[in-house]
């Protein structure tokens, strides 16, 4: 049996579908989305980013249990979402300061967990870049940072979703074969660390533990893992986490993310859903940039809808309810926050 405070429980339920699975859409990208729209359209305008997010939210949240948004460009999209769709809100600043080592995180100055909750947020989401092999003087800063977020979320009784993005300080190309060989150990180390109760994390938003570009049978060139090795990494990560976890799409194509989730399904991985971003909507950016709002809306109603509903079918086949890590639904004991 596990005790969960009412605010956290209610938030998790609002973010889940009727099976307890988090089938969520992510569009909290800021700097990267701005650049993508600018490249497609040839102009830079905050309203373009807001409008793109709003259209995606309006058209695709009827098929998502929740949406992840930011308050910098996402307020119109928050208002436009389907009434049954929960809301995760980003608390961290976009990107990191490249002039200092360690990819240190920072928070949006005029935001707090309380303000996120007051704005209708059902959960706080934090992204942190993490290399378990960085020196202690860097990682201790990140650990303390996340301890503070956990305490803040506990204080206002809102779920805390943590997204650790792994990297290696010496291998700078995260898409390389060299990093692909390091990635499984890095992801496992992040699960071990951030599952500790001291951080107060409720759901881990995880990278898949391998780069599918280098999995035998999926790779077009060099191979870093056999399919059996890849399956073992998935299973070990699943077993390592005492917390519910969901997968992020990490910028891959819709087709590749679907193959990834199929692979997880085939190996009985206990994941509780996805937060899928660019894999769902990225191809609509070119349509929006070249042809405008109406063309994007049409694309979202056809290809965008197909991307998300076909993923929903895969989740129906393989994802488990968020409470599975705690046993059954009856094993979750909801208590009032003291």
Curated annotation (Swiss-Prot):
Reactions catalysed, as given in the entry: D-tagatofuranose 1,6-bisphosphate = D-glyceraldehyde 3-phosphate + dihydroxyacetone phosphate
Top-level enzyme category: lyase
Keyword Metal-binding: no
UniProt superkingdom: Bacteria
One of the GO BP terms on file: 6-sulfoquinovose(1-) catabolic process
Pathway as given in its UniProt record: Carbohydrate metabolism; D-tagatose 6-phosphate degradation; D-glyceraldehyde 3-phosphate and glycerone phosphate from D-tagatose 6-phosphate: step 2/2
EC number: 4.1.2.40
UniProt keyword Lipid biosynthesis, yes or no: no
InterPro entries (alphabetical): Aldolase_TIM, DeoC/FbaB/LacD_aldolase, LacD_aldolase, Tag_1.6-dipho_adolase
Entry GO MF terms: 6-deoxy-6-sulfofructose-1-phosphate aldolase activity; tagatose-6-phosphate kinase activity; tagatose-bisphosphate aldolase activity
The entry's keywords: Lactose metabolism, Lyase
Similarity remark: Belongs to the aldolase LacD family.
NCBIfam families, alphabetized: PRK12399.1 (NF009065), PRK12858.1 (NF009498)
Protein name from the UniProt record: Tagatose 1,6-diphosphate aldolase
Source organism: Listeria monocytogenes serovar 1/2a (strain ATCC BAA-679 / EGD-e)
Lineage: Bacteria, Bacillati, Bacillota, Bacilli, Bacillales
